[in-house]
Each structure stands twice: as C-alpha cells, then as structure tokens.
Amino acid sequence: MGKRWLPSLALLPLPPPLLLLLLLLLPTNASAPQKPIYMVMVPSLLHAGTPEKGCLLFNHLNETVTVKVSMESVRGNQSLFTDLVVDKDLFHCASFIVPQSSSNEVMFLTVQVKGPTHEFRRRSTVLIKTKESLVFAQTDKPIYKPGQMVRFRVVSLDENFHPLNELIPLLYIQDSKKNRIAQWQNFRLEGGLKQLSFPLSSEPTQGSYKVVIRTESGRTVEHPFSVKEFVLPKFEVKVAVPETITILEEEMNVSVCGIYTYGKPVPGHVTVNICRKYSNPSSCFGEESLAFCEKFSQQLDGRGCFSQLVKTKSFQLKRQEYEMQLDVNAKIQEEGTGVEETGKGLTKITRTITKLSFVNVDTHFRQGIPFVGQVLLVDGRGTPIPYEMIFIGADEANQNINTTTDKNGLARFSINTDDIMGTSLTVRAKYKDSNVCYGFRWLTEENVEAWHTANAVFSPSRSFVHLESLPYKLRCEQTLAVQAHYILNDEAVLERKELVFYYLMMAKGGIVRAGTHVLPVTQGHKKGHFSILISMETDLAPVARLVLYTILPNGEVVGDTVKYEIEKCLANKVDLVFHPNIGLPATRAFLSVMASPQSLCGLRAVDQSVLLTKPEAELSASLVYDLLPVKDLTGFPKGVNQQEEDTNGCLKQNDTYINGILYSPVQNTNEEDMYGFLKDMGLKVFTNLNIRKPKVCERLGVNKIPAAYHLVSQGHMDAFLESSESPTETTRSYFPETWIWDLVIVDSTGVAEMEVTVPDTITEWKAGAFCLSNDTGLGLSPVIDFQAFQPFFVDLTMPYSVIRGEAFTLKATVLNYLQTCIRVGVQLEASPDFLATPEEKEQKSHCICMNERHTMSWAVIPKSLGNVNFTVSAEALDSKELCRNEVPVVPERGKKDTIIKSLLVEPEGLENEVTFNSLLCPTGAEVSEQISLKLPSDVVEESARASVTVLGDILGSAMQNTQDLLKMPYGCGEQNMVLFAPNIYVLDYLNETEQLTQEIKTKAITYLNTGYQRQLNYKHRDGSYSTFGDKPGRSHANTWLTAFVLKSFAQARRYIFIDESHITQALTWLSQQQKDNGCFRSSGSLLNNAMKGGVEDEVTLSAYITIALLEMSLPVTHPVVRNALFCLDTAWKSARRGASGNHVYTKALLAYAFALAGNQDTKKEILKSLDEEAVKEDNSVHWTRAQKPRVPADLWYQPQAPSAEVEMTAYVLLAYLTTELVPTREDLTAAMLIVKWLTKQQNSHGGFSSTQDTVVALHALSKYGAATFTRAKKAAHVTIQSSGAFYTKFQVNNDNQLLLQRVTLPTVPGDYTAKVAGEGCVYLQTSLKYSVLPREKEFPFALVVQTLPGTCEDLKAHTTFQISLNISYIGSRSDSNMAIADVKMVSGFIPLKPTVKMLERSVHVSRTEVSNNHVLIYLDKVSNQMLTLFFMVQQDIPVRDLKPAIVKVYDYYEKDEFAVAKYSAPCSAGYGNA
C-alpha cells in the first residue's frame, strides 16, 4: 500500500473505513486515455571497450520519435545511440560500446526521446569500469625442491573466456623474502598463453613464492607455489572420522588406512591419538587440564586399515571449557623399512541436536497469491531427518499448520495471503522445544527453530506477478520452463484482450537475453500461470537473473524477478584419455585430447605424491569463473547509489481524526515496488511510467521517520569495487615429479594424440588439460589418472659408499601385487668389481603371494674402486611347483623387473690431487714438455690415476666447470660468488671474441640466475650483505662482501634480470660507510686475513671498494668515487714518501684502481714500484707476500700458490690490461709473463686455490684472452706419448678450441712427453690423483677426534654413537682464516641432522652442511684456544669390517694449512650391529 496511517498516540489496527479512504487517495489512470510509453533499461555498471546491451520499449506511439542516448563526463559528451528513429511500437535490445577510459569513473547517462508533440528526457549516473582481462597462471606442480626447474604458463581470456593475445608489461618471480629473482617484460601471449621457466638455485630461500603478473590495465595477478626440501611420501595416511558428532552421542567410528601412491595397502603398525583440548591450556595442573586424550595402537589389517569404535565418555562432550572438536592424529610405520607417514582428522562437536532452515522461500509475498516454500530438518551432523512432524506458524495470516518431512527431510507449506493486511509476513518453523536446563560450564542440547520474514509487494491495483524460484543449481544445456503466476485486477486490465509480458535476463553484470510472452486475457480469468522456456547456456552462468513485467492499461508496471544458480560450465568441451590408463614403467602409452577443432591445449601430469606433499587449488571452472570482475550484479555500484530523481512528486501529509484519534501518514519501508526490483538487478531505468510507490511528503516541525532504502547486496558491491577481483622387462632409473608438461594443437576433427613414455616411478599420475579456442573459448578436462604399476618389482637396500676392504649386506626385496601367487627367481648379475655370497641357502625360486614380499641377501665385498654397479633382476617363472596349493601364474606383461644401483667404493686414506699446467705456443717450430708423474712412498695401492686435458683456450677448463671451479664447499655468501661472477667474464670474453654459442649462453645465464637467487640469502634488510646472512647474533654486515656483490650484480645486468633495488640499496649502504677522508670503514669480519696484513687495512679495503664502484661503471665524478679516489691518492703519496709500510697486496689493488679511474701516470708509477718487487723465474712473473704460512718441508712437488699471491698477481695483470684505448705491445709482453705463471696455478677444474683469487684471476685471464685473441690459420697438433707403447694425438683448431679433450694416462708413476706443432697456443693440463694414509706429523692445526662411547661394550654403540672434535690453530699466525672441518662418515652410518644443526649455536660455527657421506662445519676462524664440537651418528645400513674414517680441518684460503685425523666406530669388527 502507498500510505499507511499510524495514530500519533498509540499503534492501533487500521479501521476498515480508512482502507477505502487510502485507496481513494492513491493515483490512478484507469479512465485516462493511453499515452506514449518510453522505457530504456541499461546496466548500472558498464565496461569500457566491450559490447554492452541496453533495452528499449516504446508503446502507444502516435507519432515518429527520435531516440538519443549519450554519456557525459568531465572529458565531454559521447553518443551511444544517435538519432535512432522509431515510428511504431518497439521492444528491442541494442548493442553499444562504451569508449575506452583510462580509469574507473562515474558518468551521467542521458536518454532523450523527441517527437513533434512529445519530448522525454531523463538523466542518471552509471559506473564505467576499465576493461579487464581474466589472467591466471599455472605451475607444473605446487612445490619444488632446491635446484629444480620451475615451469609455468600464463593465460589471458576475455569475459567470455575466449583467448586474448594480451601484451604482458611485467611478470616476475618473488621469493619468500619479497625479492624479485626473475623477471620478464613486454611479451605478448600467443593463442592466449605463454609458457615460461626458470631454475631455482641449489640453496634458495625456502618458503612461499609467487608468480606475479602485471596486466596492461595495471592489475596485479598472483599465483603461489612453495620451495622446500622434502622427500616425496611413499604412501598416504587416510583418516576417516565423522565430520560432526553431537554431545549426546556415546561412540564414534575412527578408521585409518595406509595406501601406497600406486593404490596398494601398506603393511605396518598404526598409532592413533584422539584429543579434546582445553580452551585455555595451562601446564600448571597436569595433563588433564591440557586435553582429554585416548591412544590406540595395533597392526594394520590386510587392507592396510585399522578401525575402532571409540567411546566418547572419556572426552566429556558436555563440558563447556574444552574445544568443540576432537583432533585425530594417526601415524603409520611401514613394515620392514620403518618409514613413517602421518595423517589427521577433525570431528566437530555440536550441541545442536536438530536444526530447521527455510529452503527456496521468496523474500516477498503478494496478496492473493499463496506464499509457498519448504523447510529442511537435519540432525546435528547435517543429515536430513525424514517423516517427522513440523509446526509452521504465520501470525499475520492467522495460520498454523502441521506438515511432515519427506524422505529427504523436506516439508512443504503454503500460506494463504488473501487476508494479510500488513506489509510483512513472518513464518516460524519448529520441531521440538530445546532443553531449558542451565548449568555452569555444562552444555545442553539445542533444537534450532527457523524464522523467515517476507515483505509485501506494492501495487495500487492489487495486480501481481510471481516467478517461481528453484532450490537447486541448473545444468548447462538444459531448457528451463520458468513458471510465472499472476493475479490481475479487472479494473486495471479494462477491456484488454491480451497483455504482453516482457522479460530480460542478466548474467555477469550485463543483459544477455530478452523476449516477450503474449497472455490472452478473458473476462473472469485474471488469475493463473504460464511458462517461459529459457535455454541454459554458458552465457548465463554462473548466476542469471530474470525480470518479467507487463504494463497495465493504467500505466502501472507489474513484475517480479528471480535468481537462478547455474553450474559453472565452459563451451569448449575437453576430454582427456590415456590408452591404456595403466602401464608398466618405461612402456609407451597414448594420451588423447578431445576439444573444439584447432584448440591450443596445455597438458600436465603430476605424481600424486607431490600433491600429497602440497595440495593445490585445482584449475577448475569455478576458479576461472572467480576471475570474472562481475559474476552477479545486484544493486547499484558505489557512487551510483544516490537516490534518483522521482518525477512523481509526493503525497501531502493530511492528518485525519477517526473516533477522536489523530492519525498521521508515514512512509512505509517494507513494501517493494518495481523500481526496487529493477534496482536489485542492477538496472537503471529511464521511463515516463510510474514504477515507484508513492512517497509521503516531509513536513517541517514534525519528527520524521527516516526512509531506509533497501539494497540487498550493496555491501558486496562496495567490496567488489574496492578490491580487484579480479600435474616384459623394465630397468628403472627415471623418476620425475612432473611427467607431462606439453602444448598440443587439436586438429580439425577435434582430436590430438601424443605418444608418451611411462616414467619409472610406481605411482598414480594425475593428468589434466585446458584448451583455448577462438570459437568456443576455454575448456577444462576432468582430472584423470594413470596408474604406473609393476605387478611385482624389486628394490635394493645398500649404503651410499664403502671403503675398499669393507663388506656389506646387499638386500633385494621383491613385492607382489598380483591377485595370485607367483614364483620368482632373483638373480644378482656377476661382476669382476665385487664378490657376492648369498647369506641364506640359495634357492632357484621363491613363492610370493598377493600383497606379500620376500627379501634376499648377499654378503658383498667390493674389489674395484670408483662407482660399482649392482644389477638385480626378479623374474616370474613358469613353474608347475605349487604355491600354497595353487599354480603360480606368469603375468603377460611385466614378468621381469631389473634395477641397477651404484655404490661408491673409495680407497683408504685421504685423496690428494696435483695439477701440472703448461701454455705451449709453437712459433713455426715444434715445442715439447716433459710430464713426469711421481708418487710419494706412502701412496695407497691402486689409488693413483692421471689424465691429460688439451684445450685451445686458457679459459676452456673454467668454461666447462663454472659451477665446480673449486673442489670445496660453497656454503657462504662469498663462496657463492665464485659460482656467479666467473659466468659474467666468460660471457664477456666469448661475446668479444665472437665465440659465444647458444648452448654456452643458456648454461651461463642459468648459472647466473641460480647464483643470483642464492646470493639474496645473504642480504640484510638495509641492502648490505654478510657471509652467512642476516642471522640472529651474527648479523654484522660485511663492507668487502657488499662491494663484491654490488659490482657483480651491476655487471650481470646485461645478461639477466637484477632487481635495481638491490643495487641501489647496496650502493647507499656503502656510501654510508665512507669516512670524511674518503676512505671506507670496515664492517664485519674478513674471512681472508690476507686483507688484514700491514697498517694499510683501511687503504686496502678502500681500494677494493673503489675498484668495485668503477667496475660497475660509476663515473669518477660520482661523489662517492671522487672521495674514494682522494683517499687512495693520499695513501699512495704517503706510501711514496715512505710514511707507511709497503704492502704488495695493497699496491696491486691501487694500480688497478688508478687504471680504472684513467689515472695512467699514477698507475705506471705503482707498476714500476711493483716490478722492483716481482719474482721473475722460469720465464714468468708473479708477486709474493712478505709474511706467509710455512710450506711443509716434506712436499715432493711444487705446491699450488696461495690464494693471496694469485689474487695480487691477477690484479697487477688487470692493471697492465686496463688502458684508455688498447694495451701497448709492452703491456702485453709484461702481461704474457704474468699469464704464464697464473695458468700454472690453475686446478684441474679451471679454478685456483680459493674463491676471491679464482674470481679475480679468471677476470684477468678473460681480459688477456680477449686482448690477444686471433684465429689461427692452421690447426695445432698435439701428441702425448710415453717411453713405452702409449701414444695419442689431438688436433686443436678454430672450431674445437673450446672443446675439452682428455685422455687417461695408463701408467702411474711414469714419464710422458707432450709435443705441439702448428699454429696457436695450446693449454695443457695434467691431473694426478692418489690417496695416502694419514700419518703422524706436525700440522698447523691441532685436531683430536674421539667417539663416545669409545668401545663396543655399550649395546647402543652398534647403532649410534657421538663424534667429538677438538680443534685449535698452532700455525705461524695468531689465528686462521675461515676454516672447514670435513668429517667423513664411517661406512653405513649417517649423521643425525638435528644434532649437526645444533652446532650452529656455537659462537665460532657459522654454518653446517650434510653432503652425501660428509658433515661440513664452517668455522669463522680457529685460534689457539681449543674448540670442542660434537654430534651424533646412527646406523643406516650394516657394514662389516669397518675401516676408519678421515676428518680434515683446513684453512679455506691457505689450503696448505690443514690437519687430518682418523676415527673408528666403537664396534668396527664384524657387522656394526652384530
């Protein structure tokens, strides 16, 4: 009703005479002649640049009119429709495109209809949003291990899910510390997608990573993945418990099953713990105050399961102060291996015994049309309760009814609305009364009632339309018959023979369908129903809203709206099929993809074990639909929600007296009018019809009741506007985590087929595909399974390594998963490399039945050194001999399984390596070099081996080994840089000499990317870097390392992405360390104390930093550089006057710094001074330190030069080669003599002694190589021959000069001759390796190694013991540089990692690593004070006749300073567990 009268003193019922008075007051046009009708509907939210629809309705036109629709903004007016001519009745929906906009803005939309005698103009606001694409990313798996390749796809779609070849301005990878570690810019998608990849470093920051995509519109899209060290689970622990129990339940069933990833049951033992925790736990009052717990433990049954009916009494379900849930934790230990996996379950506790809720009930009622609906009765678990009586009450309708639930727990009701006089209807549903018993801290059961309130629909003529809603989600491609009920007032319809009903459908925020329905009207039949057929297609998903309305002759608009949920379907129907869907490892299978013709499909198949480790949100239609900017437009967006102009005016407030009581009209806010229905659909209406209920005029001086304009979903729309919604015989060795990651194009028939090889992992693979078509858009396949399975297979158990002379037990376990018994023959292939003896009486075959396993063992004694292969085959035999009263079968496929594993057999003692290098350059005549291989007297028998490598480039060996330049650990911030920086010099050199191949470039850039990621682990928040990163208590930033990283990152920018902020922050931090005199203050410890020597520490460090700043191409005029050069200039002038010491290391740095600064005079002056101190011998030049560690007297070969001497000599070489133009002949002559000495110091991997000398020397050699590079006209011929029969020949030419050519020398010791003839220089490198037994002698370190217990008396000593190290420095210096303690494990034992990690709590231990069978302990320095370290080890594999293991402590920068000691396991004789 338009008005409602309220007494001013008290609320009274509305008297009948007043109802007539109210109806007379309402406006009516029943007798008025028909006038032209104009109605235009447009969504209140429009998207720029995309097709939108507006619907026009013109009726009763008596003249031709023109229609104009335009938009107004601060930027001017823009026409959508211009001079559209209409000369007859019209209902039409027209498409238009809103011009592009740079940002979201509210605009005015004006509709103007003009004729000769009539003119209509309305103006309202709409929100224009910029066009948004739907962008998402997909990774090949959700979690990665360090060092793995991350592969991902970027996909872009329009709002109809069709592919967009969008330009992506920026995409980057962000690690868990918010560092950008990889970046791509300005690339365009092809076919709607792009496939990219990048490698993780071997030591990345672990945690949550993101693929971050910046779209053209500026929106940011993120896709998460994890980086973590993990071991794929062998099996899954599934815990099945009730989702909910009530406080009245006395027992619950708990079930736990262990299932292998290939679907078979796990044999083993299960432990289940069920707890109800206290809400506010305290350790002060015992375990009972923390939780009520029950524990169960037993063997799994044949199905791999355990089931228990658990009494709930012990969990005190009615106690209030405990959590309303039971936590179930299960642990299964696999039989035989002891491998453990866990699973969890959760059961909620509820006091709700029964609950009623209304289902499919309208929010409005219409007088005269029954109000129908349903209520659902469920128990506390949510299970429907059938055949129970429900009470339904509606006071406003004066109705109380009883109804019974059906088998689905639903009860239907219908309420007669004829006599409802008010504007709201409240319906109550009740099942049982709740227990009204209250107790402190006790819970009582509850039966939840349901209440529903519906508001009246306003109609002055009492004419209504009602659309039936549906309680379920509609399927795509079905046809829906929408049921429309109507009741029409005779006076309103007049003499009309028919009424036209108009309908619109909205989805995704836009008008998508429109139509009409003509209803014949006969006298006396003004109440009834009809249906409209609507086809459910993808354009309507996921939510469709329908408005149906008619215009009565009196101008009243009568209608209703309804909302339908539609399944999230996609037009491109994709299917994926494996043929077959089960297969043996290494066999072939076919994968078929069915989709719309010419679709581009992305395929993925992932090991189920990966998904168990890290579940992920599956790429689904739901996920894609969630990307839509608008899924369901309701109400008006923010900024468009102001109350619009009402042209109908208002009703005056005329008080009236009835029976002496004063009544005053007030606005009724409960009734819904047609304007409200259309607004709820997000439609703006421009019309000359009256679609609003009358408004009561406001009156001054009277307390006003504010009108509340209902908006169903305004809060949702505001949130939407403020946020951007935006995986026969077999020999198994290939075990990937992602099997398939491919793009395929479907052919014209809609099919693509690819042949794939099944990996060797026995598991279940989860495969899926998405496809993109220009015609039908996106499609997604269901996830399908492929079972990689071996009906039976064999697995080996063996140690990682043994020492020659030790014996171990090799175990082969055969598992049978066939449904029948098999007779299996197991054979260990004989080899001259080991001696194997069966440990049990040898049988030709073994009977193994379903789900059983059998283990065979051999006592093995290795006879050869190096990697020894063990090949074991298990074959199902055709045998008449019965297995448990049945004939064993032979499977048709997979009747034989072979596995190959290798064992490292190491010589006794400690391995040494000696390298002899020569640079031979024949100039017309043949040149030769004698190679004499000698061994010390204490060499371990058969441990010696030697090889010769021939290269045509002095950097050739380094290029082949850029990630293995040093046979040393790389676990700190400085050492990591030796994996990073040389790649820059290699790329620069090859670029300059035009030798760079795509293969080398790809490899070097990969190493740069991974090195970059690793180095960020050592970054501090202020932009500086330290040796072991920002660790609590050890977070002193290191000035020297920060400068090293800064210049390396700056130089790497030309090859890889480096986040500019890292460079800016490091430079800012360094500038803050600069003192007033231009020098830099030292921060953090210098791990190499060669930089600490002499009084010139500050100058040495300042020279290094200045070099770094100049190498990153900062100009000499830069304030920091200018002041730094002032510091160096002052220092050199002081040194020249003899005011300070004369440190060679410092002078070498100064010479290079002044060379970079372009100060050639000072450079020459320093080089002249250095030349006077040079060591000139063997036609080479180098420099040495005044103080250096003593070389052991018993060495029988020339040792490799110390790190500091290589480094300072390389700096002098760089100074000679750094000139304004090109180096002079004199410079190159001097450089050649230095290069001859430097190349002799290289190790067999192309590196030098340590990290910094390797980086500087390779930089210098690459610069020299580029300056002297020429292409030889003839090849160089190299011959290597012995005094005996050995002879081999190599050729080095322009095509293979980067190729590493190597030959093994047959006899050690022995004498060989190398001869080179032809043109060009040849780099010859001989590597000799051998082992020696440690012997008592004087070392620079004191090292004592002990075990606890020391003897085998303690039974636990067979399987676990403690290793204790006592270390001190007793050399020529006050303390050592950074040192490494390398503890090799006794064969068959592994370290307990938590006890190793605890070593890092020691003040001098910076880092620990477990690498293969070694424990590495990083010590920042070792002094003369004894340092004691200890950790635990435990037996992994039994080994007999254990040999002692070696512990070595060495100075990282002075490798000739070391100490070795050996230790034995307490139980060394016989088996370790005997």
UniProtKB/Swiss-Prot annotation:
Protein name: Alpha-2-macroglobulin-P
UniProt keyword list: Bait region, Disulfide bond, Glycoprotein, Pregnancy, Protease inhibitor, Secreted, Serine protease inhibitor, Signal, Thioester bond
PANTHER family recorded: ALPHA-2-MACROGLOBULIN, MACROGLOBULIN / COMPLEMENT
Disulfide bonds: 55-93, 257-305, 275-293, 476-569, 601-771, 650-697, 821-849, 847-883, 921-1321, 1079-1127, 1352-1467
Subcellular location: Secreted
Chain residue numbers at which the record places covalent cross-link Isoglutamyl cysteine thioester (Cys-Gln): 972-975
Record flagged with keyword Glycoprotein: yes
Role noted for this protein: Is able to inhibit all four classes of proteinases by a unique 'trapping' mechanism. This protein has a peptide stretch, called the 'bait region' which contains specific cleavage sites for different proteinases. When a proteinase cleaves the bait region, a conformational change is induced in the protein which traps the proteinase. The entrapped enzyme remains active against low molecular weight substrates (activity against high molecular weight substrates is greatly reduced).
Glycosylation site positions: 62, 77, 253, 402, 654, 774, 869, 991, 1366
GO cellular component, one term: extracellular space
Subunit structure: Homotetramer; disulfide-linked.
Region (Bait region): 623-752
Secretion signal span: 1-32
Expression (tissue specificity): Expressed in uterus, mesometrial lymphoid aggregate and mammary tissue during pregnancy. Expressed in ovary, testis and kidney. Low level expression in heart. Not expressed in liver.
GO biological process, alphabetically ordered: female pregnancy; negative regulation of complement activation, lectin pathway; stem cell differentiation
Annotated family: Belongs to the protease inhibitor I39 (alpha-2-macroglobulin) family.
Domain of life: Eukaryota
Single GO MF descriptor: calcium-dependent protein binding
Chief location of this protein within or outside the cell: secreted
SMART domains per the UniProt record, alphabetical: A2M, A2M_N_2, A2M_recep, Thiol-ester_cl
PROSITE patterns: ALPHA_2_MACROGLOBULIN
Cited InterPro entries: A-macroglobulin_rcpt-bd (IPR009048), A-macroglobulin_rcpt-bd_sf (IPR036595), A2M/Complement_sys (IPR050473), A2M_N_BRD (IPR011625), A2M_TED (IPR041813), Alpha-macroglob_thiol-ester_cl (IPR047565), Alpha-macroglobulin_TED (IPR011626), Ig-like_fold (IPR013783)
